[in-house]
Amino acid sequence: MCIRDSPYTAMWTGSVTHALPGALLVWAIVAYRRPLIAGMMLGLAFGTIYYPLFLLPLWMSFYWRRGLVRFLSGAVTMVALLVVTLAITSVDAAAFVARLQQMFGIRFPIGEDVVGIWKYWNDVYRYPILAGFVFLSLAFAIWPAQKNLGTLMSGSAALMLGTQFWHAHSGGLALAWYLPLLLLTIFRPNLEDRIALSVLVGGGFRKNRQGKVVVRAA
């Protein structure tokens, strides 16, 4: 890989918060034909760092016509398991609430003790960038209208790259969050025909010409 011999590899390969989210997002892409598994991978990535939460509008739009319930079921189930794990491992209620807030990112953007590009720039400039990032995340729910696997990969890479511009800690340094998806986007073949309606594995329901509900074959 292009970062194999870089200082980033030596410093952060063993860091769970650097290496694991990107790996889980790649596995979510690999399992895109199985919405339940893809949702579980995305939910687990969200439990590691909360930034994959901003991928939900894009992924939900991809599965909108088929597979949405299975995708959300996988994501919600995995997040629920992680919350239960937090409850079991926390020493008291206050510690559980604090860890839960950290997991879901329920806090005002940090402006002190930052590490990375924002250590040298005025923190006030982060807020319009953050607002633009949230707008981009929500815009992926409706644009482009029909999403294929290529859209899923490129949109996910763009959003995870976008987090680097406002991430307070090591902002701009978490290459492993977006670089695997970016490489998949660059070297992908034509994926215009890989849409959820035609490639998903698993049963579903549809109506035939007589209006009867039948089970869709896998």
What is the meaning of each model-derived region?
Residues R4-L36, Y63-L175, L179, T185-L191:
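Primarily membrane-embedded glycan-assembly and transfer machineries that use lipid-linked glycans
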Residues Y32-M40, M60-L72, I186-A218:
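Membrane-interface junctions at the ends of membrane-embedded or membrane-associated helices
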Residues M40-S61, A168-L173:
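Transmembrane helices and adjacent periplasmic/lumenal helix-loop junctions
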